[in-house]
Amino acid sequence: LRPLGLRLQERLAAALPADGRLHTEFASDNEYMVNADRALLARALDALLENAVQHTSEGGCITVRIANGTLSVANTGDAIPDHALPRLWEAYYQADPSRSTKGDGLGLSIAKTVFDLHGYTCGAENTDAGPKFWFKFA
């Protein structure tokens, strides 16, 4: 087992565009060890991080936090319409199909499936800074 924070920092670095157009913040209140299928957890983490990268404008910030057994990925992108929040985890669903972001609408659905398989809960909400996705693993 490797600490979740270390794994997340590696995955975040891999998900970021090479041009340095995005800022990141990372914080963890502990070194959490998560008992999970490594490959599946990596895929779920990649989906959350790639989603944040896709929906963060140039100069924006992606914030990853681990606290109290919950991992959250927030970004400074546009708020998600309230009616769309419950459906974000559905396969092929896109809150705003007219947006010019790439993606097929499967990433968050895959992440939710992985979280469900491990007995984790997950959710999405809007904050003052932008959208935040989270999953509770402890």
Where do the protein language model's features map onto the residues?
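Short helix-loop "hinge" at the ATP-lid/N-box region of the Bergerat-fold HATPase_c
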Residues: 52-53
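Short conserved segments within the C-terminal catalytic ATPase subdomain
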Residues: 15-25
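Short conserved segment of the HATPase_c
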Residues: 80-94
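Conserved glycine-rich
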Residues: 119-120
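Short beta-strand/loop element within the Bergerat-fold HATPase_c
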Residues: 59-70
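Short alpha-helical Gxxx[C/S/T] motif in the catalytic ATP-binding
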Residues: 107, 111
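Conserved micro-motifs of the catalytic ATP-binding
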Residues: 33-36
